[in-house]
Structures are given as structure tokens and as C-alpha cells.
């Protein structure tokens, strides 16, 4: 029986690319106060988990009220609580105590980095951070991403199939994610058979 591809399965493999090169280099150089931001499914959480594990860095997914951090920390939070006074105290704690902090977040959080969406004190603190963007994927990375998602369930299709899929999707990480899911469903619906004609019709 076909097992549907679980695209939310935990993944520890970082796909190194030109799109995330600046972010990776900034982490390797240990930029003291850093914000890494990027589109949905761009690998921010995977990078945060991998680097935190390899370098014994604390990783948190929330802004705690009790602040007892004593070493370099990663905050992985897709939506920053810009109107929360506690978030200001969180940022201030790291700056005052000279503790390195890297924030992984969404493009929207940075696009809206102004006094309309954030407390002025929060904006002031975040502007002390170095901004580093993970860019949308180009064709080569899209190909690798689709292949990677399929490999999670040991699904293999010809290069021609993936290349054809690339002609019909947007250049986003989420599109690669959804394309792999579509390929998996087409395989299921067509008794494990898939061809270029089927892709074009879909």
C-alpha cells in the first residue's frame, strides 16, 4: 500500500546553496547579534537546529518571561511579538549582558519592522542586529528540494519529471514542497506510474 509522503517529517540535512550562503557564513563567523529571515519552508528551522546542536547553542521557540540565559542562544520564531513589552526585555537582556543572540524569523516580521507593528523600543533594539536574508530558490535549488522531499519516503522519479514540474510552479520553497506532495499523490492515484503527459495535464 502506498504511504503518503510526510513532508513535515523532521529533517536535519541542510541544502547548502547560493540562496542561503550568506546566512550560513554569518553563523559560521558567529556574528554576535544576527537576524536570519526568509520565506516559508526556506530551511530556517533546519539550520537553527543543526547549528545549535553542533555548537552547543541554546535553542528556544518562544520568548520566556523568566530570563536566565547565560550563553549564546537562538530564537526560532516565525512571527516576532513586536507589541510585547516582554520581547523588548528579552532583547535588552542579551544586549546588556553581552550574550550573543540569533533570531530566525519570517520575511513578514522584517518587512513590518517599524513603529506601526512594533514597539519603538523593540525596533530600536532589533536595528542593532545584522540582517541576513535567505533568498527565494532558483531552478537548481528547486530541483534539489523536490528531490529531497521525495527521498524522505524513498520515492524516486526521473529527472525529466522534476524538470517538467519546474515549468509549472512558482520559484518558492513552498511550491517545491507542494510539488513533491503532488507527485506523491499522482503516483498513488496512477498505480505508481507517472509520465510527462500526466504532469502536464495536472
Which stretches of residues belong to each language-model region?
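Short regulatory helix/loop adjacent to the ATP-binding pocket of P-loop NTPases
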Residues: 110-127
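Walker A/P-loop nucleotide-binding motif
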Residues: 32-47
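Conserved P-loop NTPase "ATPase switch" module shared by AAA+ and STAND
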Residues: 62-93, 97, 101-109
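The conserved phosphate-sensing helix
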Residues: 169-181
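Conserved AAA+ ATPase "sensor/coupling" helix adjacent to the nucleotide-binding pocket
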Residues: 120-121, 129, 140-155
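Conserved AAA+ ATPase "SRH/arginine-finger" region at the nucleotide-binding site
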Residues: 112-114, 129-141
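Short conserved motifs of the RecA-like P-loop NTPase core
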Residues: 156-169
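A short, basic N-terminal segment
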Residues: 1-29, 188-202
Amino acid at each position: 500500500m502506498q504511504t503518503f509522503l510526510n513532508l513535515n517529517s523532521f529533517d536535519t540535512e541542510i541544502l547548502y546553496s547560493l540562496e542561503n550562503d550568506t546566512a550560513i557564513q554569518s553563523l559560521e563567523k558567529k556574528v554576535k547579534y544576527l537576524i536570519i529571515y526568509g520565506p516559508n519552508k526556506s530551511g530556517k528551522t533546519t539550520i537553527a537546529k543543526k547549528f545549535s546542536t553542533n555548537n552547543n547553542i541554546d535553542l528556544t521557540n518562544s520568548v520566556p518571561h523568566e530570563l536566565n540565559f547565560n550563553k549564546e542562544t537562538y530564537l526560532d520564531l516565525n512571527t516576532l511579538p513586536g507589541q510585547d513589552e516582554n520581547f523588548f526585555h528579552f532583547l535588552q537582556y542579551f544586549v546588556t549582558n553581552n550574550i550573543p543572540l540569533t533570531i530566525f524569523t519570517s520575511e513578514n516580521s522584517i518587512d513590518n519592522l517599524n513603529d506601526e507593528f512594533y514597539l519603538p523600543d523593540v525596533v530600536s533594539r532589533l536595528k542593532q542586529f545584522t540582517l541576513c536574508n535567505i533568498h527565494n530558490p532558483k531552478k537548481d535549488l528547486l530541483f534539489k528540494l523536490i528531490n529531497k522531499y521525495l527521498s524522505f519516503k524513498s520515492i524516486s522519479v526521473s529527472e525529466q519529471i522534476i524538470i517538467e514540474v519546474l515549468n509549472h510552479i512558482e520559484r518558492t520553497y513552498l511550491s517545491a514542497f507542494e510539488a513533491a506532495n503532488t507527485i506523491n499523490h499522482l503516483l498513488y492515484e496512477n498505480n505508481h506510474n507517472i509520465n510527462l503527459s500526466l504532469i502536464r495535464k495536472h
